[in-house]
Amino acid sequence: MSSTASPVIAALEGATKAYGAHRVLEGFDFALEAGTVTALLGPNGAGKSTVAGLLTGRLLPDEGRVRLFGHDPSHQLARARMGIMLQAGGLPETLTVAEAVDLHAGYFARRLPTAMVLEQAGLTALAGRRCDRLSGGEARKVQFALAICGTPDLLVLDEPTTGFDPDARRAMWDVVRAKADAGAAVLLATHHMDEAEALADRIVVIAGGRVIADGPPAAIKAKVAATAIRLRTRLAAERFRALPGVVKVETIGADLSVLTTAPRPTLEAAFALDPALVHFEVTGASLEDALANLVSANRTILKEAA
């Protein structure tokens, strides 16, 4: 990503969206820049898929407006420059993988060769298989292929690696990163923190219908005034949750990960609780820690304002 300002590709301006009496977004402002991967994070129901739906024209805002390349999302000039991979999406069951990609690519003036798309999506070996005979992860790869086949300037990916094995996830990350480096704006809605950290130039955290944090991954993690301590101990997690400054305790294999705002007192108390403790590691807060902390703080603010 360039250090200079990049052109704004897409924007939500004062967007409000409700489902019945439940307002998911309210006065929501959001913009995507060329050459940048923006990860949209938040708890379940925060509105990540709604943002993706509004940007792609699958949903209409109740208030406010959506602009893609200066147009409404329904405008042909906007749709021709966009690639979409949403959570829900069917495939033409009777077509082979290659036929489905070739058919979809035909709608775009800047289509990539079908063989290139299949290679980038990890589908070369499945080119001749019918779409109704694909596994869930294989079908998601085809949906990714359909999203990239038209050389999009805006790529919207909603939970793209669901059903992928680790190697397939990393391969997709490489392709997405290359698209952004070539100038595309990428919106990544995901609940995988490692995916966000691996890909994102910018992270936007949403909760309660609004943006509660926006910045590079390092800046988002720095918002947590806490330290992570990994301990190898025979004691149960419950023994550590009551210690001063402890925000969160979770079990990771044979270890406990303790997130604390008071690392020295926490370590001293840990040694007092378990004199046999010899293995520990002190690190900064993770992106997952930061997300949990930001969302929790937002809930507290909303309760106090009610």
Predicted regions and their residues:
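Conserved structural motif at the start of ABC-family nucleotide-binding domains
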Residues: 10, 25-27
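Catalytic Walker B motif of ABC-type/P-loop ATPase nucleotide-binding domains
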Residues: 155-159
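C-terminal coupling/interaction segments
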Residues: 2-4, 261-306
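Conserved ABC transporter NBD signature motif
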Residues: 56, 64-74, 78
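Conserved ABC ATPase "signature" region
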Residues: 102, 106, 112-127
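The feature captures the beta-strand-to-loop junction immediately N-terminal to the Walker
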Residues: 41-43
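ABC transporter nucleotide-binding domain
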Residues: 173-261
